[in-house]
Amino acid sequence: MRVVVQRVKRASVTIGGELHSSIGRGLLILLGVEESDELSELEWLVKKCANLRIFDDENGVMNRSLLDVGGEAMVVSQFTLLASTKKGNRPSYIRAAGHEVAVPMYEAFCRRFSEEVGRQVATGIFGADMQVELINDGPVTICMDTKNKE
């Protein structure tokens, strides 16, 4: 699994011209699921995202997590995070999981993340054409991959 975690002032998802979900201060998490991903990897990623200390403390130092600040969260599926641009100029998405793997993994991530942070997590709709708006705060953007835990 690969995620892009963005600290936001606010974020929203619109589908078909209708507002689907929105959050205030917190995290927007874009999640890409790889064909070879397993549920055992999900727990590491959930805990890492929930506990990332990327919010400022009283001294202006990024030392607080989403849990510490009581922020909101939104998780949006994004298979393009697994694009390969190794050959040619057209990205290949062959590593991205198909629906039969990706949907249950996405739903499990959302469910576990919601449990971890103790509140409902806003989402997009898997596979939908979505317009995602955000005000990136900082900007602070962190990329993580369960296959390369740096």
Residues of each region from the PLM?
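Short basic, glycine-rich beta-strand/loop surfaces that mediate nucleic-acid
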Residues: 28-32, 135-142
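Short, active-site-adjacent segments that bind or coordinate small-molecule cofactors and metal centers
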Residues: 122-139
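Short, low-complexity, polybasic intrinsically disordered segments
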Residues: 95-96, 137-150
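Compact, glycine-rich, soluble single-domain proteins
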Residues: 18-70, 77, 81-111, 116, ...
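A short, compositionally biased micro-patch
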Residues: 6-8, 69, 135-137
